[in-house]
Amino acid sequence: MLDTPPELIADIEAFQRRWEDRALRDWLQQMPDQFSLSMSETRFGDLPRWRAALAALPSLKAEMIDLDASAITALGPAAEQVLLELETALRGLHPWRKGPFSLFGVDIDTEWRSDFKWDRLSPAIDPLEDRRVLDVGCGSGYHCWRMKGAGAREVIGIDPTPLFVLQFKAIQHYLNIDSVHVLPLALEQLPPKLKAFDTTFSMGVLYHRRSPIDHLTDLRDTLAPGGQLVLETLVVEGDEDTVFVPPERYARMGNVWFLPSPAALMKWMRKAGFTDIQLVDVNQTTVAEQRSTDWMTFYSLPNFLDSADHNKTVEGHPAPRRAIVTARLP
């Protein structure tokens, strides 16, 4: 067995205390090896730099936290020099893509205003009170904190990008809540037919999958009977037989495979075994929701759209539209 990466030891200890379900306990035995491979400095050459940034976070105590505000917030007293140290350490984890966050007055203005998406979906989903929740492709965990703020008993986010895991750890360092986790895993690394979660979220993942039906069935297998799937993905206009396959890039992304119409997406979900399928929202992404900032200085949505017509991508395809669909496991 490989050694557990130091930043993930507390997660395993928390699972050991809480998990009684047989399938989860079996998964727990696999985690040290999974985490060691996912957080390998041999595979990810920037990991030492990111870990140094995490280690440089100053010691501060939050007197108030807010998981329900637009920005996940921790407040408390801090000297000016300490705040400079805090900001320097956090900027060492650039680029910050999903948020926003506010730590002791240091505002992390992320590329995405992820609160916009939460505001669109939260009124339409099953209440999260006392639920075990999975967030697939969670990034740095912004929505995981919102799920906890909505009353979830336990939230597990998974994302294979080590930087996002360490960004989450930076926020967790000050929020100090041990029932929210971001693990360095892809959905395919979870045990098959886990059937352990009351609600599973998959947002911004499906269009990156070469086999969308396989992704939907993998999501289905994470859910306990009666559990709810909350799915968000790129869509195009059309009927239930409309699916757009970008010939090359889409909005400068080379890893976009299938963009269904909402009706086609719901047809796929029925094929994958879901019931009670509801279209919650369709929204064209705006440059107010996704843009470059001081905390994410690379290209963003304004660079991916036709400068003369924001209804088209630079390649001439329909501009990004995102649908939110809920469904249930019988």
Predicted region positions:
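A short SAM/SAH-binding and catalytic strip from SAM-dependent methyltransferases
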Residues: 198-212
